[in-house]
């Protein structure tokens, strides 16, 4: 029973933090994240192909194609994480580096995005029988720092003050 409660509260915590991150992303990048020209071109091609298929289809097939069309235009959690880390790691990166170093790991934002996305999807879709990705616990801690950083940044707080706040609130004890 306690294990079920731990799993339940763990999944809620995980989903809550990733949802908070996605909420902040929508505010930060209202038109979506910046994409490479190759990605934009590929998305345009797929969208046009799907539109053509949608116009020539009906019923369930059309519904599925319309759902797919919406997916093409939305950013993945992984790409959102990578963009934010590229744009704002100067604020929270030192905490991530330290956290991963303490665990004899190297921080890689690309891998972090993959793990968080995979684990979030497992929880969101009820795949609780899938093995928990252990390192994603560290990713989640760092994602909390990211969310906090983005929230404070949206209020115009200086980067050094955000770092001091993270240090104090999350008991990081880093010499900044």
Name every feature range the model reports, one short phrase each:
Residues 1-176:
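Amphipathic, oligomerization/interface secondary-structure segments
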